[in-house]
A protein has these predicted regions:
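Beta-rich nucleic-acid/ligand-interaction surfaces
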Residues: 69-81, 181-182, 266-274
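Conserved N-terminal entry element of GNAT/NAT acetyltransferase domains
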Residues: 2-43
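Short, conserved charged micro-motifs
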Residues: 47, 149, 285-289
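Short beta->alpha transition motifs characteristic of CBS
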Residues: 100-106
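Short, solvent-exposed loop/turn segments at secondary-structure junctions
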Residues: 44-45, 105, 141-142, 178-182, ...
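C-terminal/domain-terminus segments
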Residues: 259-294
Length: 294
């Protein structure tokens, strides 16, 4: 934890969380690891929102990031026109074990969209993409949740798939992926180079207001097959003591049609480097579609 950060807020009584959970309809009933999925607005479930904000800050500080506040919560989490929260709930242990926040472009107050605080949206993105998109962000899984943590992210992806299937007209997922501030600088350069090379932006739809430009260096990705370059990236990152960040890894496996845009340093998130992404839903691999979107 960064020494200057104040302590994270203490957990709330489980009974407060259970009371709010009991008033929600499960998006997906308890399955593997006894997890159930729920979606809610922070303004309607203040105790759950506080617990999610506490767990987010705890998770992000654990990798050198975080907001530096006692809770990772902003006005967009509590605005009735802002984000909805998706959580994985471990009923056996009465706790939240993972979460995402999401916002549907066609029905939101655009001022609540986190990506818009750091990236300018092109007129074409505003017209042709945003009304058919869901922004995703702030994903986390609780590390000390035992077996439940192993299923949390998979369960959350199933929940997101259910949301996509229910939201008529949704064609795109977008948002920001994060490289922790503690990530080795050369490993970060290689990862950003790989993303630009193999997941390039086809046009300037999302433009960072203050672009992060990594230092120049050698380009080792000269193999003809994507799979060989991917294996090389993993090898090079390991040499620097790093791995592909989990969410970047997940999106890379979700679709080869993902586009990555500018990188920027987020001063509100521990100076982590974040990259804007856009992913067409119909480009998601068949295996992932069958597993998650139904």
């Amino acid at each position: 934890m960064t020494p200057s950060f104040p302590p994270i807020a203490p957990p709330l009584y489980a009974s407060l969380l259970e009371d709010e959970i009991s008033r929600l309809t499960p998006l997906l009933g308890a399955a593997r690891g006894a997890l159930a999925l729920y979606s809610f607005r922070g303004c309607n479930c203040p105790a759950l929102m506080q617990e999610v904000a506490r767990l987010r800050e705890q998770a992000f500080r654990g990798v050198g990031g975080g907001t530096g506040r006692v809770l990772d919560m902003d006005s967009n989490d509590t605005n009735p026109s802002g984000y909805r929260q998706l959580v994985a709930w471990d009923a056996a242990h009465h706790r939240v074990v993972g979460g995402y926040r999401y916002i549907v472009g066609a029905e939101c107050d655009r001022r609540c969209i986190s990506t818009l605080h750091y990236f300018d949206f092109s007129p074409r993105f505003e017209r042709d993409f945003l009304p058919h998109a869901i922004e995703l962000g702030r994903s986390f899984a609780v590390r000390d949740a035992g077996a439940s943590s192993l299923f949390a992210m998979q369960s959350l992806w199933q929940g997101l798939g259910r949301i996509v299937a229910r939201c008529e007209g949704v064609k795109y997922l977008f948002g920001k992926v994060t490289i922790p501030p503690t990530f080795d600088a050369e490993a970060r350069r290689l990862l950003l180079l790989f993303l630009r090379r193999f997941f390039p932006a086809r046009e300037r739809l999302l433009v960072a207001r203050k672009v992060f430009v990594p230092p120049s260096g050698d380009d080792p990705f000269t193999e003809s097959r994507y799979e060989d370059n991917y294996a090389l990236l993993e090898h090079l990152l390991r040499r620097h003591g790093e791995r592909i960040p989990p969410m970047i890894h997940a999106y890379m496996r979700l679709s080869r049609e993902m586009q990555t845009f500018d990188a920027m340093v987020n001063p509100d998130f521990g100076n982590a480097v974040e990259v804007a992404i856009l992913l067409p839903v119909d480009s998601i691999t068949t295996a992932k579609r069958e597993a998650y979107i139904r």
